[in-house]
């Protein structure tokens, strides 16, 4: 924060910060290994993630949520009667990057985790704002290859698995969330996303 331009930006422009994989390592999940990556002197990915989250929480301009929720990154930012912004966390509660073709939900198919999905659905249902904006770490329909598993199957970093047909893997959790939004009749939900290096609507 020694740069006058950075300080000016922070004092004049509202910012919403989100946890990203690069706080730890590219395409971070608990399954990631940096054992053969010479850039890392610390090889324990969970320890790297804890250090990255601490640095993020100490540096990011976020409103505190109290001692009980000091490590929680997902949050709601009310913007008056026009908008509620739901900032979700697609990194801290996800299962390992895998072949992403599991037929049933479980810890290995989590992207948000059950508590966060329920928090989001409950918040969207309670919201009286005209627009419900979901700020997502990454697009929900993007498929990002992340190497191969021990059996030679493609591993996936994001929600989608690149397969046609019924949802499988991480898509199951997202399908449950989207179905919950539809079944509750929640209107004016808009997804805003980052992580990709282009704009689209």
Map each language-model feature to its residues.
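Metal-dependent phosphoester/phosphodiester hydrolase catalytic core
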Residues: 1-201
